[in-house]
Amino acid sequence: MNCSFTAAVNALCKFNGFPRDKTEATGTLFCLPEKADPPFSHVIAYLTGRGIPLETVMLLIHEDLLYQDTPHKNAVFVSPDKEYCEIRGTGSKSFHGCRKKKSDRFWYILTDPKPETAYVCEAAIDAVSLMLIHKVQGMNGHAAYVSIGGVANQRTIDRLTNKLPVVLAVDNDSAGNDCRRRNADLPTLIPHNKDWNDDLLEIVRP
């Protein structure tokens, strides 16, 4: 990694984001889930339980890229432009959903303010997990770790390929295989387990 994680998050917050398409409309009805009052204890417990270091969770919260909603106590990952959010349940019942202003929006985190490669994952927790795995392996480089909220979001993949070299890093399952076949011209990175968070857990809890 070319800079500390703190510096990387600061760089992310100063980054102006990926260029917008000139033809996109504005004013689309969109709202983020209501934010709970800190300290977001359910989100912190959930993500640290998934192998994400407390330092990483707290930095994402501090930089307004992650919060806990109310009344459901979900984890909400918010894109820097606030036009996309990914909602992850923190309770015993699994829940994963997205809200976005336009269909091609996405969540991302950078390891450098001038990314040279975008690693495209299915979920924000997997994007963060892959970033942490690369950090352990010493291969973060100048990268953006992106969540598209599911492999059906082909418009986002197409948009990203017009901005940066893309590596498909979607799940190791049938839907991921379909996505790789659909984008056969793109390089791929496939998790050993079902997804990158499972791979991270295998590293931190051998």
Regions flagged by a language model, labelled:
Residues 78-83, 90:
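Short acidic-glycine loop/turn motifs at beta-strand connectors
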Residues 95-116:
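Glycine-/acidic-rich phosphate or pyrophosphate-binding loops and their flanking alpha/beta elements
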Residues 1, 127-136:
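Short active-site loop/helix that positions an aromatic residue
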Residues 115-116, 132-206:
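TOPRIM fold recognition
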Residues 122-123, 172:
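Helix N-cap/beta->alpha junction signal
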Residues 44-56, 80:
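Serine endopeptidase catalytic core focused on the charge-relay Asp
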Residues 1-49:
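Non-catalytic accessory segments of DNA primases and related replication-initiation nucleases
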Residues 55-76, 100-107:
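Active-site-proximal, Lys/Arg-enriched surface segment
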